[in-house]
A protein has these predicted regions:
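Thiamine diphosphate
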Residues: 1-168
């Protein structure tokens, strides 16, 4: 089989997801214009428009809050946080609001937000942190997924789009 960059696998999978799910959208720092920092969304803003594939400011807590609001209203948002190191800025909102919505409302409300990020590069001093142990404890009520490769990541997105529960 031909070798393909991981970004191409993700881009093609997101393309199929946006085609299949009209309520799916993705937003975050650099998602739209450049197609995310690794070009995993390359060309999708042009194809699906600025509402479904959009850029945001550098405010992780706001990105998470926007995602919760969109999910509560029946959309299927994917909120991108550029690097796992930055997830800590949104942890309070994820822990108190997102992760507990189904439980607190006895299943009457759902916020199936997917929080997309990348990490575990384990090189250099920037973007290489791994708060995973803390996330597992702090985000009870959310799926926390760490794919081994981009094919598995694509499969996770496909499965999560059918779920009513939030995930990181």
């Amino acid at each position: 089989p031909e070798m393909v960059d991981g970004r191409v696998i993700l881009r093609d999978n997101f393309d199929k997801l946006f085609d299949k799910y009209s309520k799916a959208l993705i937003f975050g720092e650099d998602c739209g214009t450049i197609g995310d920092v690794n070009q995993g969304l390359e060309g999708l803003q042009k194809k699906y428009g600025e509402i479904r594939v959009s850029d945001t400011g550098i405010r992780e807590a706001t990105i998470i809050g926007q995602g919760i609001g969109l999910a509560l209203r029946g959309l299927r948002p994917i909120a991108e946080i550029q690097y796992l190191d930055y997830i800590l800025y949104g942890i309070q909102t994820m822990s108190d609001d997102l992760a507990t919505t189904l439980y607190r409302t006895v299943g009457k409300q759902k916020a199936p937000l997917i929080v997309r990020t990348r990490g575990h590069r384990l090189e250099g001093i920037w973007h290489s942190g791994s708060p995973m142990g803390g996330l597992i404890h702090l985000l009870r009520g959310m799926y926390i997924l760490v794919p081994r490769d981009m094919t598995k990541a694509a499969g996770f997105y496909n499965t999560l789009m059918k779920s009513d529960e939030p995930a990181l």
